[in-house]
Amino acid sequence: MTKEQLNKARHQLGLTQAAMAAKMGIGTRKWERWEGGHSPISAEGATLLRLLVELNKQESGL
């Protein structure tokens, strides 16, 4: 996932970077590095993020 995709996903969920990190079960700094493009998101992290976005869409009725 690109940093733009990570940023878009976080905004779709309506979360701050700290809240997104907490929801993902990681530290804020790690999320900031992923979203800033300084380190790649793990495969597990990308899968969890996709699931969170999909769940949010379903709960929102989209």
Question: Where do the protein language model's features map onto the residues?
Answer:
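DNA major-groove recognition helix of helix-turn-helix/homeodomain DNA-binding modules
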Residues: 25, 40-62
